Amino acid sequence: MSNKFINFEKISRESWKTLHQKAKALLTQEELKSITSLNDNISINDVIDIYLPLINLIQVYKIAQENLSFSKSLFLKKDIQLRPFIIGISGSVAVGKSTTSRLLQLLLSRTHPNSQVELVTTDGFLYPNQFLIEQGLLNRKGFPESYNMELLLDFLDSIKNGQTAFAPVYSHDIYDIIPNQKQSFNNPDFLIVEGINVFQNQQNNRLYMSDYFDFSIYIDADSSHIETWYIERFLSILKLAKRDPHNYYAQYAQLPRSEAIAFARNVWKTVNLENLEKFIEPTRNRAELILHKSADHKIDEIYLKK
């Protein structure tokens, strides 16, 4: 792995946790459980060892951003314009992006109690299923061409310029964009942007999404481990879908366990693994920080861009 990250400094978990003075986790076990995704695994010790030092590092980047903005305003002889601090979080399906994003949102809210900390997922910028069907792209859902990148870039541009912005809302229960529903963002102090595609931009050579980020994180793991987590999550989703006939996954909920596993493994290999290897993992080096997970979901190595 180290050969792939020649512009990164490798930091062990043991070394990383010393970069923050021991403190309380800033949240309870119940709160941590409520923000942990299906089949993810995170403990209070992980919060203290990994995420509190990360919050410190984000603060370093935020101060640097503010100092640069101030220096630019002096140079240009203009009033300083405070801009949202945008954090991009990427990685494979089922690697734990959502848990990390929600945890960072909560910790930033606790460490910056007077700041507005918002979270948006790029799922909302997928084209609606009907459009994907009309374009023959439904089986490419999640691949770069299934996202409305122009809309996503316009959203980020509005956010960065301090304007009110609106994002479509995606529901995993119906596997589609929710019609006529928007999430509004009114000049937040922090915005976390989470999605498999946050370092990609296949449709627009003008700029990348990452051009808008002040800090960025890639969640990394061996693909064989992610496959296991994906299958485990799929089985958990089916268990929940049995109670809701309107859930998209209810159609698979009655499958025998062996067939459900075979179905999930096929989806992983033909869709998610291909997407990971061709489009997601190659963008990994655009991140400022890479968090590597071992088979038990624990972060064992950290890579910080030099």
Swiss-Prot record:
Give the GO biological process terms.
coenzyme A biosynthetic process
SUPFAM superfamilies for this protein: P-loop containing nucleoside triphosphate hydrolases
Q: What Pfam families does the annotation carry? A: PRK
Known EC number: 2.7.1.33
- What range does the record give for the signal peptide? none
Q: What enzyme class is recorded for this protein?
A: transferase
- Give the subcellular location: Cytoplasm
Give the UniProt entry's GO cellular component terms: cytoplasm
- What does it catalyze? (R)-pantothenate + ATP = (R)-4'-phosphopantothenate + ADP + H(+)
Write the record's keywords in alphabetical order, separated by commas: ATP-binding, Coenzyme A biosynthesis, Cytoplasm, Kinase, Nucleotide-binding, Transferase
Record-listed ATP binding positions = G91, S92, V93, A94, V95, G96, K97, S98
Which pathway does this polypeptide act in? Cofactor biosynthesis; coenzyme A biosynthesis; CoA from (R)-pantothenate: step 1/5
Q: Give the GO molecular function terms.
A: ATP binding; pantothenate kinase activity
Q: Which domain of life is it from?
A: Bacteria
Q: Which HAMAP family match?
A: Pantothen_kinase_1
Q: Belongs to which family?
A: Belongs to the prokaryotic pantothenate kinase family.
| Name of protein | Pantothenate kinase
What is the organism field in this record?
A: Streptococcus pyogenes serotype M3 (strain ATCC BAA-595 / MGAS315)
Which gene is transcribed and translated to give this protein?
coaA
